[in-house]
């Protein structure tokens, strides 16, 4: 099992969270227990993405296929679905995983066993210190809408990840927005409920704020909207 330790190394026990996570951050992570992760691909990537957020998971897989490299870091990998199905440029990519939830790290590591990924239990809202060489691609797929704060404050994640990128490296991902995008009434009700349950914190997340925060940090960037989801990439 994976233990979340302060050094971000692999150990043998399995607390759910890193000790230094804040209560607000912890709420968004602890919901991803083993039971939920067992139905995550069907419920989240299948039903919610298609029928509520109006962005089928194939669009997210296309983003991976376009931007992933053979030297990749995934922050908040969920179940590892996209890493399992995307096309890497080589048969033996270097893969590292960062998450604050040991369950997610364990499930993804097992799923990607053929790639021997290295796991680190870290909070992306804090400075990330890991003993590892920089990466050529970093994914933050479905992470931002689960983090506390607004796009303006939670974009500090990009500041923490930028030092982990090689020059010319790309950070990419997606996030579900509430402002500046079109949503159906069922989608809005679902989003409101997920915010009430503290699974999401995105009622103030705005499309223009995302574009602004990326542009302030990366000269070369792009944001594309499908449904109420923003798919983005930015180059260091």
Where in the sequence are the language-model features?
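A short acidic, Gly/Pro-enriched loop at the edge of an enzyme's catalytic core
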Residues: 129-138
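Residues lining the SAM
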Residues: 141-145
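A short, conserved alpha-helix within the catalytic core of class I
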Residues: 147-160
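C-terminal alpha-helical "lid/dimerization" subdomain adjacent to the S-adenosyl-L-methionine
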Residues: 172-223
């Amino acid at each position: 099992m994976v233990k979340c330790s302060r050094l971000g190394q692999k150990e043998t026990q399995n607390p759910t969270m890193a000790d230094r996570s804040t209560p607000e951050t912890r709420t968004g992570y602890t919901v991803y227990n083993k039971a939920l992760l067992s139905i995550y691909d069907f419920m989240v990537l299948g039903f919610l993405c298609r029928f509520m957020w109006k962005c089928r998971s194939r669009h997210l897989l296309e983003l991976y296929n376009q931007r992933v490299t053979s030297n990749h870091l995934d922050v908040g990998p969920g179940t590892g679905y996209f890493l399992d199905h995307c096309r890497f440029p080589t048969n033996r990519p270097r893969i590292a995983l960062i998450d604050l939830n040991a369950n997610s790290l364990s499930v993804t590591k097992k799923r990607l066993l053929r790639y021997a990924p290295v796991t680190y239990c870290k909070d992306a809202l804090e400075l990330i210190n890991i003993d590892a060489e920089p990466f050529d691609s970093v994914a933050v797929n479905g992470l931002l809408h689960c983090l506390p704060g607004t796009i303006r404050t939670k974009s500090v994640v990009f500041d923490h990840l930028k030092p982990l990128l090689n020059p010319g490296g790309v950070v990419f991902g997606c996030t579900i927005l509430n402002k500046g995008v079109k949503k159906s009434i069922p989608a809005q009700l679902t989003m409101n409920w997920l915010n009430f349950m503290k699974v999401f914190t995105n009622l103030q997340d705005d499309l223009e704020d995302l574009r602004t925060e990326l542009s302030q940090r990366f000269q070369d960037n792009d944001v594309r909207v499908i449904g109420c989801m923003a798919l983005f990439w930015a180059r260091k």
